[in-house]
């Protein structure tokens, strides 16, 4: 017997719209069960998708997609959308090489109106679509679906401010679950969640005082009165909640509706039908529960935000509560987290800043041990960097823990607010290089290129876990802005010191002596260079720093070898290999140079090893490319 008879009938939103509205709650249950099964086996974003099931069904039921445009913010919650838009039978390939992307992707489906991965872009994109439709004389509807966490970012407010002053038909759906990845921070979430109802509570207190003695004498009356009191409180709080939210968004020029139960799919359909007929900017405030329908995720939405897989228990189609086995080798994130706590214990000036990535950036222990020196500024990368600059001006030692892909969002602040003033801010740049399943929106392939051209910046790339700690300590003590970039996942297994040793800034080291060919390698590619060099009897230099780069070492290697190969897990254009070429040109050295990095292409999602091989950066691919490049007599050696 088919466990999902309704879902089985749906291959497109057109099929969905043939259902009776009363069938939608049952469909929601089937879709949620399908999510538990599919994500449980393939992994992926979990809790946010469970919370968006009814909302997704209602949106596709009411709006004429793909003619009407649904723009999902970030895209963590887009799995139900993919299931309902013809990709149900491909869900087993989610985030795998050659399979479905973990986020909406325009080239994947006509229903994916806008490619996403970063937060707070949906309102601006949907507004642009609405403006284009008006200019072209169309009658389409544009809908932005954004979470309350993403709404804290400045870009979302910039778009709200612009939309409120434009005569376009735009609906913003605020999916309010009080979470982004971590619990939300800042004034806006408190504003949205405020339940201050002083007058009603005062009235209730008076009534209780006046009637309590009488009610005590009537059997069952007190219990009934308590239920009535609870209901009145709830209604009053909802009314106050709506009043406050209405005031905020209507001041932006939006007509506010809500808050609405985001898990009552039939009511959502009625509300959305009404909103679709309205003109001008509209905002629908929907209350949902992250992880809805799976208790473990409801109780710990941070832990279940994304999962590697959820094994079955006893054959049941339910996630397992078993924790994954800890890695034998520490991750670079763990190395950073331990270094940060050790350094903070020795230096009371150290403060840590994160743009809503406490868990991912390894700051959980730091927050617990040093809460007064921990700052989660929300999804606000630009503010995080400028805030760090202000702290540095007053003698503090800020460490900004940020993913490479998110540092892109704060580039002006890095240049204007930090580097031009030569402020000693340390950027711990996580997820540098290929990241795997999250794909191109999260790949850290551009930081070496955009950092090394910034004045006063020190840019370091460790080759293993111990070197990561060494370079963090070194850059922390530098009286200048600095960035240490390190990859996702585990390193080489190198023993990690507990000390605070430092190295000389701008100096690399020779890892292997060889002949004729010199590998000048950066960061994670040092291990690859060593593996290939064993087969080619080549020299390997671990440069450690991209800026300042070790000119003396480069010149010495160029003059003592026949050729040079540069290796980096970064874009070739403007990257570390380019820095090597600049040194050679400066010193008038003309030698054959092979630059190996990420070519001018958009990387895909999938297993990192497979992606590196496709990009020509695995050890096997590097050996093949170098042998093809070598003169025939050397390639045979």
UniProtKB/Swiss-Prot annotation:
GO MF annotation terms: 1-deoxy-D-xylulose-5-phosphate synthase activity; magnesium ion binding; thiamine pyrophosphate binding
InterPro entries named in the record: Dxylulose-5-P_synthase, THDP-binding, Transketo_C/PFOR_II, Transketolase-like_Pyr-bd, Transketolase_BS, Transketolase_C, Transketolase_CS
Function: Catalyzes the acyloin condensation reaction between C atoms 2 and 3 of pyruvate and glyceraldehyde 3-phosphate to yield 1-deoxy-D-xylulose-5-phosphate (DXP).
One GO term (biological process): terpenoid biosynthetic process
The reaction(s) this protein catalyses: D-glyceraldehyde 3-phosphate + pyruvate + H(+) = 1-deoxy-D-xylulose 5-phosphate + CO2
Chain residues that bind Mg(2+): 148, 177
Metabolic or biological pathway: Metabolic intermediate biosynthesis; 1-deoxy-D-xylulose 5-phosphate biosynthesis; 1-deoxy-D-xylulose 5-phosphate from D-glyceraldehyde 3-phosphate and pyruvate: step 1/1
Cofactor list: Mg(2+); thiamine diphosphate
Major enzyme class: transferase
One cellular-component annotation, GO: cytosol
Protein name: 1-deoxy-D-xylulose-5-phosphate synthase
Free-text comment on the cofactor: Binds 1 Mg(2+) ion per subunit. Binds 1 thiamine pyrophosphate per subunit.
Protein family membership: Belongs to the transketolase family. DXPS subfamily.
Chain sites annotated for binding thiamine diphosphate: 76, 117-119, 149-150, 177, 294, 381
Keywords: Isoprene biosynthesis, Magnesium, Metal-binding, Thiamine biosynthesis, Thiamine pyrophosphate, Transferase
Quaternary organization: Homodimer.
One Pfam short name: Transket_pyr
Organism: Neisseria gonorrhoeae (strain ATCC 700825 / FA 1090)
EC number: 2.2.1.7
Keyword Metal-binding: yes
